[in-house]
Structures are given as C-alpha cells and as structure tokens.
C-alpha cells in the first residue's frame, strides 16, 4: 500500500499571489478608472488586499502632493529673490511682520504714535510742566497728611519767621530807609500775614498740648482703676476746654479784645434774628 503524500499549504505562495494580484489591480485601476471590468475584478479581491492597496494609494498621493508644494515654494523663493526686477518690492502683510523669528526674541512694536488732540499753545503752561515738579509729601495718593508730625519736623522754621518779623519791623521803623508808599504797604501786608500765621501755629500747638495732656490724664486714671472706661471728649467739650485754656494764656488786653469781638458777634446775630421781614399780601 503506497503511502500518500501530505501537502501543506504554503503561506509564502499566498502572500506572493496576493501581492501580484494587488499590483495588477493597481496598475489596471490607474489606466481604466470607472470601467465595468474593473468593478468585477475589484469584487473578487480580498479585503486585506484592498486595504493594502488603499494605503499604498494614499502614500503615493501624499508624496506627489509634497513634491508639488516644494516645487511651488522654490519657484516663489526664486522670483522673490530676483533683484534685477524694476518693480517696487511687494509689501509684506502685517501678520507676517508680527511673527517672531524665535520664540525668545523680543516682540516688535510700531514706532508710529497718534498725534495728540491737545495742542500746545505758546505762553500757556502745558500739562507736563504743571505736573513735572510735585511734592510727594503733599500728594493725596499717599494718604492724609499728619499735621502733628509735620509741625514737629519743621518747628525750626519758627526761628526764621521771628527773625523775618523783627527785620520787617525794624525796616518800617527806620526813617532813613528810602521806601516809597507802595513798598511800605507791601511790607506791612507781609508782616501782618506772618504774624497771623505765627498766631495760628501757636494756637494749634496749644490745642494739641491740651488734648494730649487730657488723654494722658484719662489713661493714667484708667490704669490706676479710678475710671472704668477712658472718656473721649466730644466736639462741644473740646471747644469749651480749648476756650478756657486760651483765655487763661491770654494777656489782659488780648482778653478784652476777644471779649469785645464775641459781644459784637452775639449782638449781630440777635439783630439778624429780630430783623423785620415784609410779608407778601
């Protein structure tokens, strides 16, 4: 009995046949697109062969497209770099100019600035000159000014003011000084303003001293246990205490003048209240 030959399937042969079939269909598909025979042959091909054919076609199309793009870009570069052309250079768009060459490169901005609507008139101070020299000590942006601290820091100016007052008084008393009437009036006004300023500063210092002493007494009595809570003065109480302290510090003549001013002020107020007002009938 003769032993039968066992034939095994060869995968290599199948792959070769499928590759041949694929190349045959591709070449035929490029030449005869849309024919009926092509459709019949495509229906007989396996799905794996069709998939491989599709991927090959995609690769071929992509390669062809990149070659065309490279050719176009090289043509554009050639025509752009041609320096023999007589025509004006083409203006690049704003989008191209805004693009940075490198991400770490500094950003570019236009040097063109719009013209100011406010025209500078010769003879009038401009806004820039007005705000050029500003004293930050008196700027509202830095908060409210501390008058007590400013007075303490600039207390040495009182000596200069006193000396200036003495010089002005001696100049006015000197009969040999060749001053006309206008200059004398101007010096008198300056002297009066300086004296009034010195008086206001003295009164302010007196008020601050009285109020600070009162606060110290209240805090000491609170620490000793004499008072349960420190009492803070109202405006009316402050006014009374300050008036009493001012009257005590005044000279007799100054006190009489102050009393006379108060009396006249009160009388004027009473007369205004008793004025006859005609009624419209």
UniProtKB/Swiss-Prot annotation:
Domain of life: Eukaryota
Main location: nucleus
InterPro entries: RRP36
GO cellular component: 90S preribosome; nucleolus; small-subunit processome
Compositional bias annotation for Basic and acidic residues: 65-75, 245-259
Cellular localisation: Nucleus, Nucleolus
Skewed-composition ranges (Polar residues): 24-36
Acidic residues: bias regions: 76-89
Coiled-coil segments: 48-78, 161-205
Keywords from the named record: Coiled coil, Nucleus, Ribonucleoprotein, Ribosome biogenesis, rRNA processing
GO biological process, one term: maturation of SSU-rRNA from tricistronic rRNA transcript (SSU-rRNA, 5.8S rRNA, LSU-rRNA)
Family: Belongs to the RRP36 family.
Role: Component of the 90S pre-ribosome involved in the maturation of rRNAs. Required for early cleavages of the pre-RNAs in the 40S ribosomal subunit maturation pathway.
The name this protein goes by in its record: rRNA biogenesis protein RRP36
Gene field: RRP36
């Amino acid at each position: 009995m003769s032993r039968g030959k066992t034939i095994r399937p060869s995968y290599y042969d199948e792959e070769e046949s499928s590759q041949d079939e694929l190349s045959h269909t591709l070449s035929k598909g490029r030449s005869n697109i849309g024919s009926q025979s092509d459709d019949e042959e495509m229906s007989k091909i396996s799905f794996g062969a069709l998939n491989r054919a599709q991927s090959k076609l995609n690769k071929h199309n992509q390669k062809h497209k990149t070659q065309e793009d490279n050719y176009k870009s090289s043509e554009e570069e050639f025509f752009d770099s041609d320096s023999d052309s007589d025509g004006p250079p083409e203006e690049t768009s704003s989008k191209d100019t805004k693009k940075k060459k490198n991400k770490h490169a500094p950003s570019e901005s236009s040097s063109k600035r719009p013209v100011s609507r406010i025209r500078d008139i010769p003879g009038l101070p401009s806004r820039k000159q007005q705000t050029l020299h500003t004293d930050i000590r008196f700027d509202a942006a830095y908060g409210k000014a501390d008058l007590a601290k400013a007075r303490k820091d600039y207390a040495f100016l009182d000596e200069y003011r006193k000396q200036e007052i003495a010089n002005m008084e001696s100049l006015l008393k000197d009969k040999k000084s060749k001053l006309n009437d206008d200059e004398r009036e101007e010096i008198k006004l300056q002297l009066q303003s300086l004296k009034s300023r010195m008086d206001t500063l003295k009164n302010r210092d007196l008020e601050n001293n009285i109020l600070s002493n009162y606060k110290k007494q209240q805090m000491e009595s609170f620490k000793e246990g004499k008072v349960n809570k420190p009492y803070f003065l109202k405006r009316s109480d402050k006014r009374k205490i300050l008036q009493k302290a001012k009257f005590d510090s005044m000279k007799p003549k100054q006190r009489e003048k102050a009393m006379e001013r108060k009396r006249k002020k009160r009388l004027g107020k009473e007369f205004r209240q008793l004025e006859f007002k005609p009624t419209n009938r």
